[in-house]
């Protein structure tokens, strides 16, 4: 018991010093251009009018459908959710003991009553609304056997008070790509869209270690 009383404050103190999740770093290899495009291609003499890399049919447009092709993702995300919960319950017990009688005498000292009552009432309300508008240019990193494009890309903005980054990954059907090589973010399957930042502005929106300590799930109050 003594050891428990000593370890509990230490654990709570460490919870308050817990660091937030590490932010992503620049120059991530996962978001680099496809490796097979970095290797120099063999130069072939095809004449001045014909280039194998840019060959396409007269009935075919220049939409992105090959590894390394570039397309623009139009970000149009809007979510809204709300939830409300309420719980209440109560329990009440009453028990009375009559005065026993022995040889015609009542033993008043042994009489009495016991009662107990417990009540709980809790309620919670949660509401969240998110909106993201903009655009980001990504590259095709893989073409699946069924023609679905695996896209991936990032954008970093270095500002006076820190950095902001945006990352998009997911699967896109080639048929959903418009003629101007753009696609809506709502057409991306398994989409992973990240928009965050780091620096002075981001630190100002982060809770300090003492606030995290009191808001930690292990805090008893």
From Swiss-Prot:
Source organism, top-level taxon: Bacteria
Entries under PROSITE patterns matching the protein: PROKAR_LIPOPROTEIN
Topology of the protein relative to the lipid bilayer: Lipid-anchor
GO cellular component assignments: bacterial-type flagellum basal body, distal rod, L ring; cell outer membrane
Alphabetical GO biological process terms: bacterial-type flagellum-dependent cell motility
InterPro entries named in the record: Flag_Lring
Lipidation (S-diacylglycerol cysteine): 17
UniProt-annotated location(s): Cell outer membrane; Bacterial flagellum basal body
Keywords: Bacterial flagellum, Cell outer membrane, Lipoprotein, Membrane, Palmitate, Signal
Molecular function in Gene Ontology: cytoskeletal motor activity
Lipidation sites (N-palmitoyl cysteine): 17
Range of residues in the leader sequence: 1-16
Family assignment from sequence similarity: Belongs to the FlgH family.
Cited function: Assembles around the rod to form the L-ring and probably protects the motor/basal body from shearing forces during rotation.
Complex formation: The basal body constitutes a major portion of the flagellar organelle and consists of four rings (L,P,S, and M) mounted on a central rod.
Annotated HAMAP family: FlgH
Protein name listed in UniProt: Flagellar L-ring protein 1
Gene that specifies this protein: flgH1
């Amino acid at each position: 018991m003594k050891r428990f009383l000593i370890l509990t404050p230490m654990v709570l103190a460490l919870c308050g010093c817990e660091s937030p999740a590490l932010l992503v770093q620049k120059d991530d290899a996962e978001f680099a251009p496809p490796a097979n495009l970095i290797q120099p291609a063999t130069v072939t003499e095809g004449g001045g009018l014909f280039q194998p890399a840019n060959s396409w049919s007269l009935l075919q447009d220049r939409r992105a459908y090959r590894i390394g092709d570039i397309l623009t993702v139009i970000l149009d995300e809007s979510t809204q959710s709300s939830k409300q919960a309420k719980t209440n319950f109560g329990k009440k017990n009453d028990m009375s003991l009559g005065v026993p009688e022995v040889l015609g005498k009542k033993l008043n000292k042994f009489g009495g009553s016991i009662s107990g009552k417990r009540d709980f009432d809790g309620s919670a309300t949660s509401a969240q609304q998110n909106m993201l508008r903009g655009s980001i240019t990504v590259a095709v990193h893989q073409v699946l056997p069924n023609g679905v494009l695996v896209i991936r890309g990032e954008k970093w903005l270095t500002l006076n008070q820190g950095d902001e980054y945006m990352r998009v990954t997911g699967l896109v059907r080639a048929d959903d790509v418009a003629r101007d090589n753009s696609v809506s973010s709502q057409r991306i399957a398994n989409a992973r869209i990240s928009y965050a930042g780091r620096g002075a502005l981001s630190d100002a929106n982060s809770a300090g270690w003492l606030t995290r300590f009191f808001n930690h799930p292990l805090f008893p109050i």
